[in-house]
Amino acid sequence: MHCLPLTLLLLLLCSRAEAEEIIGGTESKPHSRPYMAHLEILTLRNHLASCGGFLIRRNFVLTAAHCAGRFIMVTLGAHNIQKKEDTWQKLEVIKQFPHPKYDDLTLRHDIMLLKLKEKANLTLAVGTLPLSPQFNFVPPGRMCRVAGWGKRQVNGSGSDTLQEVKLRLMDPQACRHYMAFDHNLQLCVGNPRKTKSAFKGDSGGPLLCAGVAQGIVSYGQNDAKPPAVFTRISHYRPWINKVLKQNKA
């Protein structure tokens, strides 16, 4: 079964999978998700792309490793990404830290830290998001939330405004059709009997369970049928802490 990474590629000329967006969700209340980051990316193939991400320190954003590029500009404090507001903060990424074991074929270890050129100013529209502890286990059946600027329809375009959707954490067996799925590294998210999912353009965004980031949008099926695969943050807390410490975050 063909899978595709959830990176919102705006030029659909390459054979790579694209990013995810929110399908079956609703528009977020403006600035109710102050940790959300919109990433504008010049890819390694010189294409334009976009992803989601989230602020975890004033100068660090967490996202998916498949969102890496030659150049990344981060916008914080946005709701409608096409209408600039006084709440916006645009910050250049000066260093990218993809996980050293990231595999571009299997999309395992699909996690990356981005160091910003300047520290963000924390406001009502810009804030940080707490991460799952290392040994935190979120049981199947838990309802969580995902937000992003991705597509709202399989054949549609990306959303200008931030969208969000409630998704159910599934038993790992529900993702057994994904050959590279590893429940130790990843989460299986989205009820296959529903039409709600993250889709193209949502890659890198957070999965929130009880106000804590438990996952990162990674990949799903090219028809957006759930479940999709999310990177399990708790597994990577030692690596995240190491990078932050070494870079004085």
From Swiss-Prot:
Enzyme Commission identifier(s): 3.4.21.39
Record's PROSITE patterns? TRYPSIN_DOM, TRYPSIN_HIS, TRYPSIN_SER
Listed GO biological process terms: protein maturation; proteolysis
The places in or outside the cell where this protein is found are: Secreted; Cytoplasmic granule
| Residue ranges listed under propeptide | 20-21
- Segments spanning the bilayer are none
Q: Which UniProt keywords apply?
A: Disulfide bond, Hydrolase, Protease, Secreted, Serine protease, Signal, Zymogen
> SUPFAM superfamilies, per this entry?
Trypsin-like serine proteases
Q: Disulfide connectivity? A: C51-C67, C144-C209, C175-C188
Query: Which CDD domains does the UniProt entry name for this protein?
Result: Tryp_SPc
Q: Where is the active site?
A: H66, D110, S203
What's the catalysed reaction? Preferential cleavage: Phe-|-Xaa > Tyr-|-Xaa > Trp-|-Xaa > Leu-|-Xaa
Q: Name one GO molecular function term.
A: serine-type endopeptidase activity
Q: Give the Pfam families listed for this entry.
A: Trypsin
Residue limits of the Peptidase S1 domain?
Answer: 22-245
Does the record carry S-adenosyl-L-methionine as a key word? no
Q: Superkingdom, according to UniProt? A: Eukaryota
Give the signal peptide as a residue range, or say none if absent.
Answer: 1-19
Alphabetical list of InterPro entries matching this protein: Peptidase_S1_PA, Peptidase_S1_PA_chymotrypsin, Peptidase_S1A, Trypsin_dom, TRYPSIN_HIS, TRYPSIN_SER
Gene Ontology cellular component annotations, sorted alphabetically = extracellular space
Similarity remark: Belongs to the peptidase S1 family. Granzyme subfamily.
Q: What does this protein do?
A: Major secreted protease of mast cells with suspected roles in vasoactive peptide generation, extracellular matrix degradation, and regulation of gland secretion.
Q: What is this protein called?
A: Chymase
Give the encoding gene's name.
CMA1
